[in-house]
Amino acid sequence: MKQLYRYVLMFVVLTLCSCALALQAKHSSIREDFEKSMKGYNKLLRWRDIEGAGMTYLDPELRDAFLKSAEDIKKRGVTITDYRILTSECLPEKKTGEVVVEFDYYALPSNRIKTLTYRQKWSYLDTEEKKGWQLKTGLPPFD
């Protein structure tokens, strides 16, 4: 009887450990996807593919307003010269992430470089249609 109890206990412990490892691996994968998404989005903004950034990463409900802002930014001649990711926080268990980015930019006809801080809120979708990170905040005002 004692022997059976030990085997059952060992089985339960091993099962719990394997579940914990599987969850940790899933969270690691979600973190890697977050890193890729937030870097990809900001890189597209940097290289003036604002519409592509919005269509790829933005929540569909926010796209119309985003595209209007993108059009306004292009009309005003705003050019992003550099960006720095100041902080990024990914919370896989809550399926949320937050990024603080600093952009250096100028708006024609001025050649003066300005700096803007942009706080981005992200959420992770895990549905049959789509898995991945979506941006929940629109473009900042490039004054």
Language-model segment annotations:
Residues 91-143:
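Exposed beta-sheet edge and beta->alpha loop/turn motif
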Residues 40-48, 56-60, 125:
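Structured segments of extracytoplasmic/periplasmic soluble domains
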Residues 19-47:
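Short, low-complexity N-terminal intrinsically disordered segments enriched in polar/charged residues
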Residues 35-36, 50-97, 111:
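Short solvent-exposed beta->alpha transition segments
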Residues 13-15, 74, 79, 129:
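Short, structurally constrained coil/turn elements
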Residues 8-18:
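Bacterial N-terminal signal peptides
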Residues 1-8:
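Bacterial N-terminal signal peptides that target proteins for export
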